[in-house]
Amino acid sequence: MSILTSPLPHQKDALNEIIARANAYYAGTWRNLPIRPRWHSLVCGPTGVGKTALAMLAAEATNSSLLRISAPGWMPAGAHQRGTRESITVIAEHIAFHDRTIFVIDEMDKLMDSGAGSGSGGSSAGGSDSWRSYVRGEIYELADGRWPSGMRLPDDDHCNEISLDEITTKLRESVFILGVGTFQSWYDQTSSHRSMGFGAELDPCLPEMTADVVASRLPRELANRFNSDLIKLPDLQPSDYRQIALDAERQLPAELQESFRSEVSKRIDRAIDAKKGVRFLEECVMQALKNASMAQAVPCDPNLNF
């Protein structure tokens, strides 16, 4: 559920930067320059700060369509499964239908090998590493403005009217890629450095997880294909929690608003302490729906035997 209709204070700088990059990319004045910038960008930040919602606002501001694919659900070319389409086919079809596209690859950090936290791009054992390699390869080719070898256009009347050369031009000139991720394992590693021994105190002098720190830990192949200046969102502030709760309440049906407001008042302090982000709203909505359901339920006859 997206409850943002305008950016929160902590999101404004990041949103403005995404919009500026996307508009400059679409303008195309860079194409004839001897040095071509890397426009595709990475957005990072803790869970629940509105990274994906930010992409939706950016798409609206730049008159772009929004295509979002979650990296863990990416289906590589050739991995045919009944009822599941290859992600490349979905992307090609979307591009064929739209003039401009902001393409969000969500949970990019899930594509990292287990050893990639150090920036080495090391590999992990097991079959999942093979899947990650295929998906990373396809994403790298898209970021380079190429389709994976052997790709076929969707068997669709509209797509049959556009050639592979035309859809490649659109990929290179009208598709702005945003890689989104929490990179939570790096935050966890940083926050849990301890000296040897049980019960040791946390190190009070840990480095801050800035955008530069995250960028320095990216596998080189990934870093080479995206803008080196990562866009980082900070944690939600207490005032942000209250604002998004108010915005969410206004969008709910009238019969749920009072119960939702009550749940927010019970949970918001714990949500702020635990840094749950907008996820705490889901808990409040679920409890409000449960309350409504219980209020409408027909009481059970105590004389019934089961």
Language-model regions, residue ranges each:
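Walker A/P-loop
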Residues: 37-69
